[in-house]
Amino acid sequence: MDQPLQAQQGELNWRLSAHPITLLFFLGFRTSALLMYLFGVLFIKNFVLVFILTLLLLSADFYYLKNIAGRRLVGLRWWNEVNTATGDSHWVFESSDPATRTISATDKRFFWLSLYVTPALWIGLAVLAIVRLSSVIWLSLVAIALVLTITNTVAFSRCDRFSQASTYASRAFGGNIVNNLAGGLLGRLFK
């Protein structure tokens, strides 16, 4: 008798997510902007309304990914700070402590796959818009989509790299240095 297959952590099944509502909203915003761009003019005859709705969905996707989904699904967050005195701008990356928080393999897989696939789809649509030469307005909308999606992709990639580097560094050096310092200080205090 065949046994039903059990879903394994890491599969692309939203039911395995540690945060299913966050994941569904994340995927919903990611796909809705693309779908509105592709099929909006078929259902809504007003070009300006389709343009504005697509732009609003892109903005919602950017905000939700940057401020909510990244933090809840993979424990990463980023923002840009500007020094008001000098006008210099720099990115700040934050990651959750791997010792206190476990990231669901399913959430992680959905997050990174969607993060890299979405800009690739928008690049394909940009090439299509250039080849068709139908309207510069459509190309401008794709350019806005590319700026927003690539910004999040680059920022989260850097944030993940920063997170991995600090985790490896703390594992390699943290335990030994802290133990040596604490042992040396306590040894001196109680001699």
Curated annotation (Swiss-Prot):
It comes from the Eukaryota. GO terms for cellular component: Golgi membrane. GO terms for biological process: protein secretion; vesicle-mediated transport. It is found in: Golgi apparatus membrane. Keywords: Golgi apparatus, Membrane, Transmembrane, Transmembrane helix. Golgi membrane protein involved in vesicular trafficking. Belongs to the TVP23 family. The chain crosses the membrane at residues 16-36, 38-58, 110-130, 136-156. InterPro entries: TVP23-like. It is a multi-pass membrane protein. It comes from Neosartorya fischeri (strain ATCC 1020 / DSM 3700 / CBS 544.65 / FGSC A1164 / JCM 1740 / NRRL 181 / WB 181) (Aspergillus fischerianus). This is Golgi apparatus membrane protein tvp23. Pfam families: DUF846.
